């Protein structure tokens, strides 16, 4: 093989290596953007830049807690079917050392909120909640499900009797169901 052919092959390999390096940079940027999208879509991220280099997961519960019934498209919601798998993933990740829950919610679906609260209460890592603004209705059990709960001086919390929308049949079973839900809520408070 001539010297000219050898130089062309080396140039070709150098171009491929440069192209692979460029592709790697593009992939790394996509991964970084996906993390940003994850934060944008679900209000969750892992905080790592603190003084002790501890990995703390940030979970925000903002707006209405959405359960099986979808809220209107223009309402800010926290969807429990996104939060529950994330909580399971956090519990499974040995590198995450704690969780900070930020709350500003008007409440929402009782069953969905209680499911999230029960998952938060069962976490093996330390969990701290911070109420920013308000944590009303089903937001109260969400706030107190953590190991330590804090509220800003201007924050508010309000709990009220369970209500249902739609047609409710006035039977003993309906009353028992209301009582059961109320007891589940009171167990947290």
Predicted segments — roles?
Residues 1-140, 144-189:
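N-terminal organellar transit peptides
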């Amino acid at each position: 093989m001539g010297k000219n052919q050898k130089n062309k092959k080396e140039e070709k390999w150098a171009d491929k290596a440069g192209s692979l390096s460029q592709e790697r940079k593009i992939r790394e940027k996509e991964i970084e953007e996906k993390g940003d999208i994850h934060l944008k879509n679900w209000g969750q991220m892992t905080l790592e830049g603190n003084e002790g280099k501890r990995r703390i997961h940030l979970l925000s519960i903002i707006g209405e807690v959405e359960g099986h019934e979808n809220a209107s498209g223009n309402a800010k919601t926290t969807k429990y079917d996104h939060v529950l798998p994330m909580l399971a993933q956090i519990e499974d990740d040995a590198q995450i050392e704690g969780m900070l829950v930020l709350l500003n919610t008007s409440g929402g679906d009782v069953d969905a909120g209680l499911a999230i609260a029960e998952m938060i209460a069962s976490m093996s890592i330390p969990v701290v909640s911070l109420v920013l603004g308000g944590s009303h209705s089903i937001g109260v059990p969400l706030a107190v499900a953590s190991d330590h709960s804090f509220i800003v001086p201007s924050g508010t919390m309000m709990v009220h009797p369970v209500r249902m929308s739609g047609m409710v049949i006035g039977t003993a079973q309906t009353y028992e169901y209301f009582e059961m839900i109320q007891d589940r809520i009171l167990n947290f408070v």
